[in-house]
Regions:
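Gly/Ser/Thr/Pro-rich low-complexity, intrinsically disordered segments
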Residues: 1-150
Length: 150
């Protein structure tokens, strides 16, 4: 799907990819339906097109699969787009279904949330006092998202 990093398009919009797209521009994040994306959105600093959308306008999206447990990675928009949180479940566990993850994110206050991936690609790394800590195998990762504190 559509990927933009630092304003550079790495992959084009895929109109037939159902789901949603995270767009970040002018220090604001939003998640829009992929079908509503123009072919070449202007002014985008970061974009990730994926599926399924889990939360829309603070409510669980209907039709999410109630079965199929896996490690999950998701993004959550809050505070009118001023806050973008990344969530990942413990890759060593069976993980939630998409419906369970969406319910939890809605209850946790996400105005919008997007599932990124699951299974063996679920991973994170961060720099702590003891160096870089890695969580999950992070297999088959064509892209990653890097966060900086502001």
């Amino acid at each position: 799907g559509y990927v933009v990093s630092q304003g550079v398009q790495l992959s084009p919009v895929r109109p037939k990819l159902d789901g949603a797209t995270l767009l970040v521009s002018e220090a604001r994040a939003r998640i829009v339906r992929s079908a509503q994306l123009p072919r070449t959105p202007a002014g985008v600093e970061l974009a990730v097109q994926c599926k399924p959308r889990l939360v829309e306008a603070g409510k669980l999206v209907s039709g999410l699969k109630p079965e199929g447990r896996a490690a999950r990675t998701a993004l959550c928009v809050r505070d009118a787009g001023r806050t973008l949180d990344a969530y990942l479940t413990d890759p060593a566990e069976r993980g939630p279904t998409l419906a369970e993850l969406g319910s939890w994110l809605a209850a946790d206050g996400c105005s919008d949330a997007l599932n990124l991936d699951g299974g063996p690609s679920t991973a994170a790394a961060y720099r702590g006092e003891a160096g870089v800590l890695r969580i999950g195998p992070g297999e088959f990762l064509p892209y990653s998202i890097r966060f900086w504190p502001r």
